[in-house]
Amino acid sequence: MFSRIALLPAFLPVALACLGYEGGVPTPTAHYSNSAVIEIAAGEVFDAGWAKYDRGSGACGGQTEGDWKDAVFYLHSGATLKNVIIGADQSEGVHCDGACTLEFVWFEDVCEDAISIKNDKEGEETWIIGGGAYHADDKVVQHNGCGTVNIINFYAEDYGKVYRSCGNCSSQCKRNVYVEGTTARDGGEVVGINQSFGDTATLVNVCTDADHPCVLYDGCEGDCEPSKVGYCSG
């Protein structure tokens, strides 16, 4: 059953609006395969003009975790990436070193993680606006920093988790996620957060068929495995 979730009962419009674009990945205007990651400097904006970028045939190694050098794009703090399609031939999609902004970034077939956010500080905000991701066996957004991730009008289909707060980073902290106007189909959890570290999740106008859109974990530090402990309420 497809449902609409609003975990904030106050200050909501009368009609729920799930605005994730459901028309599929946009048709690319060009296609570039690069042997190395593309870096976007702090504060700069990279507008791809709806071109598709990847790392070449055979780049995806399944769920083998890579680092920023394996990504298609590497954004330094405050950088913006917009109007781009990340092709299937990649190990890691987009890495952000600090808070970043992604506007209309599409992932046609996620390999390990689509978006990894690291080193953002408490009080800093990452914005993921529009765009979407298909076929993420595990996570679409992996959040290892300590700030807030805002996911607005996103679309996800065939996924494990749209957002996951790092369950076993070597140094843990409180993280926040805000999801609004997002559509998530044929997947697992919309968000997974660590109850043990005080994480917060707010879901507003989220359309999903997930049995439990927001899942709580007992996160841990280092060489350990976080355990699922319950579900969010609101």
From Swiss-Prot:
**Where does the record say this protein resides?**
Secreted
Query: What is the residue range of the signal peptide feature?
Result: 1-17
* Swiss-Prot/TrEMBL keywords: Calcium, Carbohydrate metabolism, Cell wall biogenesis/degradation, Glycoprotein, Lyase, Polysaccharide degradation, Secreted, Signal
Which Gene Ontology BP terms does the record give? cell wall organization; pectin catabolic process
Record GO terms (molecular function): pectate lyase activity
User: Per its UniProt record, what Gene3D superfamilies does this chain match?
Assistant: Single-stranded right-handed beta-helix, Pectin lyase-like
Which domain of life, per UniProt?
Eukaryota
Task: Name the chemical reaction catalysed here.
Answer: Eliminative cleavage of (1->4)-alpha-D-galacturonan to give oligosaccharides with 4-deoxy-alpha-D-galact-4-enuronosyl groups at their non-reducing ends
UniProt keyword Ribosomal protein present: no
Annotated EC: 4.2.2.2
Q: What is its main location?
A: secreted
Give me the comment on cofactor binding: Binds 1 Ca(2+) ion per subunit.
One of this protein's Pfam families, by short name?
A: Pectate_lyase
The entry annotates sugar attachment on N168, N194
Cofactor(s) the protein needs: Ca(2+)
- Explain the purpose of this protein: Pectinolytic enzyme consist of four classes of enzymes: pectin lyase, polygalacturonase, pectin methylesterase and rhamnogalacturonase. Among pectinolytic enzymes, pectin lyase is the most important in depolymerization of pectin, since it cleaves internal glycosidic bonds of highly methylated pectins. Favors pectate, the anion, over pectin, the methyl ester.
Q: Which family does it belong to?
A: Belongs to the polysaccharide lyase 3 family.
Q: What is this protein called?
A: Probable pectate lyase F
What is the scientific name of the source organism? Answer: Aspergillus flavus (strain ATCC 200026 / FGSC A1120 / IAM 13836 / NRRL 3357 / JCM 12722 / SRRC 167)
Where is the organism placed in the taxonomic lineage, from the top?
Eukaryota, Fungi, Dikarya, Ascomycota, Pezizomycotina
Q: Which gene encodes it?
A: plyF
